Amino acid sequence: MTQSNTHNATVLVISSQVIDGQVGIQAIAPGLRAFGLGCIGLPTTLLAAHPAAYPQAGPPAGGALPAKHITEFADWLMSAGAFEELAGVLTGYMPSVEHVEATADVIDLLRAQKPDLPVCCDPICGDNDRLYLPREVAAALGKHLLPRAGIATPNLFELGHLTGTSPLEQTQDTARAAQKLNVPNVIVTSAPGPKGRIATLLVGDQLLRCETVAVPQVPHGMGDLFSALYMGLHLRRDKMALGIATSTMAKLAGKSANKKMLPNEQVELAKAALQETLSLPP
């Protein structure tokens, strides 16, 4: 896909969904729309809000949706012709092994029609030295989804857990760990940087590194939005994809520091700035 023919193209997003807030599909969709891409959101979970959004209210209503819905919905959408303009697949939060396996089945189904369909896997399983999904789910991500992906976007903790190579304190150590995933392009977020800075690495045919100012606390949903921005830039075959996505997210992080959730107005401002930078229509 070239920079001139993304119009009317869509991306299938299989991830979490909330009714209130911008995490999961809600954070990914505006990132894709910045490039004129449609978003077909297929939820793995449905919650009233992210658990951190209203801690005083207790655990949010909702939960995981049946894993069989993933294949059932995808089968129906395919028969309806909804995937005719499909440009890629982006996978995110998976609450169970069954959801991982169903998502892998959908990717295989789609690639039977479009063998070169790009797939980006955000192997969400933990952060800040804490695994927040069962170990068997993290293992299933490595067994079923990463082998089907052309792009993976783990954070530093996820990379270390998935490869059994933590702690990762040097760029070369991180790059070697990323190669163990056997994914053509691995973008590692929250990689080590000099004091007061944080790095993002692209490990593929070459090693690229972008550094930005470290923000002590960033809102939930930032990783989801980053994967969407990188996916959009990748589909445009933009050679500056890593730098553009990283700088956009750094500006957003700076303006949203110490907030628990992504502010909608800041996401829209980031979207507008990105469109202006790339000379994209609003």
Regions found by a protein language model. Name each.
Residues 37, 75-83, 108, 112, ...:
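Generic secondary-structure signature for well-ordered alpha-helical cores
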Residues 161, 216-244:
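Short, small-residue alpha-helix embedded
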Residues 89, 155, 223:
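Residue-level signal for inorganic ion chemistry
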Residues 239-282:
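Charged C-terminal helix
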Residues 18, 45-47, 95, 125-127, ...:
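Glycine-rich beta-alpha junction loops
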Residues 131-208, 215-217, 237-238:
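Conserved phosphate/ATP/ADP-binding segment of small-molecule kinases
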Residues 2-128, 267-282:
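Conserved N-terminal subdomain of the carbohydrate kinase-like
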Residues 74-75, 99-111, 115, 171-178, ...:
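Short, electropositive alpha-helical surface patch
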